[in-house]
């Protein structure tokens, strides 16, 4: 789906030719109510951070062909469809810095049925766009959880849109949620699985973690037995394997405000471990606020790992546990001016992360708000990345935006996080 804004979130990037950065590009949609022949396109003025770039130097790419403005004006077989994106490429030696930019575009179109004195028609747009650097790996693997796009998925975005966004960041991993993403869960159709595989191949993405639930309290009159809970988990482990995932996060039902899992969690996992090992799927319970690392819940998981010696049960760290400042991210059911105790920042120290790191299999890079200067207002990323690097972690950092749910906001925030993480990682 195209975004409502003429300027699209996706596609804002530097352009490299012959080993050097020669400019930048952005994607724009047709702003008129109908398409137009290329000869009727009268150019586009682009302004970035107050610096203007004339329409005379901007090159247009449509349907795999690239044109100067003069070439468009003389063209006879080029058409810009209403549902088609055009790429505007602006020459600029060295390109733009990574980060957030104020981008404005004015597109000029002629229309033969409108009197000449009115022409060209002007279509103006302005928005903040984030450019993500292609470097800054530092040994980490970057991905995105589709939870980041909650509210936009299936309303403003398709699964393919989400995958295209992830690939556009230069990220290579996708994390999904069983009951949010998988059509026909728990038994998706062969057609859905075929489409899933096609999209993975198209956008060159690797399945990372699949989030599932063990709904221990499914009914009001009784809880699941350990056997029933294990059957749920086993079903999701098989699904994870079918879809290509190496990690699965089971969210067990909880029995306390500190998120103590249902007492049957251990037997549930024990019943499923052999299956997980045979399919090479790692079960990762999530360490999520308000549960810190130095807590009986986390320590019980670690003791289980040590006792069993298994390689198929590890911790998933949600970086929200390192939150240092209060955030009102719009949790439903809570007064905006009152933050309940379980939403208060935990401020888990980096020393705790370093100590737990040998037991960690996956990092959910939770965040709430990154401003236009690429400052995260709540999560201390520099300390987190340094601790992970120093501890030898070379796994996934999977973006999980959990801020306010406004249209398209998650998409822009994820871009900001990747720009921030790459910048910090390049300095490690």
Locations of regions flagged by a protein language model:
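Acidic/histidine-rich catalytic cores of soluble enzymes
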Residues: 174, 210, 273-382
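Terminal leader/tail segments of proteins
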Residues: 1-133
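Accessory recognition modules or surfaces
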Residues: 93-95, 110, 115-118, 173, ...
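N-terminal pre-domain/capping segments
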Residues: 132-245, 277, 310, 314, ...
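Active-site acidic/histidine proton-transfer and metal-coordination neighborhood
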Residues: 201-202, 218-317, 324
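Short acidic/histidine-rich active-site segments
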Residues: 396-404
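Active-site-proximal loop/turn and secondary-structure-junction residues that shape catalytic pockets
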Residues: 148-150, 178-180, 213-216, 252-256, ...
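Short, solvent-exposed loop/turn segments at secondary-structure boundaries
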Residues: 153-157, 185-189, 220-225, 259-263, ...
């Amino acid at each position: 789906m195209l975004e409502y804004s003429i300027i699209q979130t996706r596609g804002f990037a530097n352009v490299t030719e012959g080993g050097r950065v020669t400019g930048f590009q952005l994607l724009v949609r047709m702003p008129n109510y109908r398409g137009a022949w290329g000869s009727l396109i009268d150019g586009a003025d682009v302004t970035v951070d107050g610096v203007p770039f004339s329409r005379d130097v901007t090159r247009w790419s449509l349907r795999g062909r690239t044109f100067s403005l003069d070439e468009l004006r003389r063209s006879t077989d080029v058409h810009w469809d209403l549902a088609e994106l055009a790429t505007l490429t602006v020459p600029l030696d060295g390109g733009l810095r990574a980060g957030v930019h104020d981008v404005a575009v004015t597109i000029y179109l002629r229309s033969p049925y409108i009197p000449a004195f009115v022409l060209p028609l002007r279509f103006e747009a302005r928005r903040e766009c984030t450019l993500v650097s292609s470097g800054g790996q530092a040994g980490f693997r970057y991905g995105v959880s589709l939870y980041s796009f909650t509210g936009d998925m299936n309303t403003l975005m398709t699964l393919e849109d989400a995958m295209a966004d992830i690939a556009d960041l230069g990220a290579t991993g996708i994390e999904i949620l069983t009951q949010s993403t998988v059509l026909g869960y728990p038994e998706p159709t062969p057609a859905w699985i075929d489409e899933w595989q096609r999209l993975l191949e198209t956008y060159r993405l690797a399945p990372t973690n699949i989030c599932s639930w063990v709904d221990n309290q499914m009914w009001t009159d009784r809880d699941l037995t350990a056997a029933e809970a294990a059957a749920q988990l086993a079903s999701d482990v098989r699904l994870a394997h079918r879809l290509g995932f190496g990690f699965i996060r089971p969210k067990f039902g909880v029995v306390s405000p500190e998120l103590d899992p249902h007492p049957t969690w251990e037997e549930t996992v024990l019943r499923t471990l052999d299956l997980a090992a045979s399919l090479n799927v790692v079960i990762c319970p999530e360490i999520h606020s308000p549960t810190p690392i130095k807590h009986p819940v986390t320590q019980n998981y670690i003791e289980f790992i040590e006792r069993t010696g298994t390689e198929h049960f590890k911790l998933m760290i949600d970086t929200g546990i390192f939150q240092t400042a209060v955030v009102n991210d719009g949790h439903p059911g809570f007064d905006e001016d009152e933050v309940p105790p379980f939403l208060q920042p935990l401020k888990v120290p980096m020393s705790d992360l370093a100590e737990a790191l040998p037991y960690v299999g996956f990092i959910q890079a939770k965040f709430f708000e990154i401003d236009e200067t690429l400052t995260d207002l709540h999560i201390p990323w520099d300390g987190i990345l340094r601790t992970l690097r120093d501890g030898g972690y070379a796994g996934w950092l999977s973006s999980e935006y959990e801020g306010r749910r406004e249209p398209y906001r998650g998409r822009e925030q994820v871009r900001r996080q990747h720009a921030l993480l790459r910048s910090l990682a390049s300095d490690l």
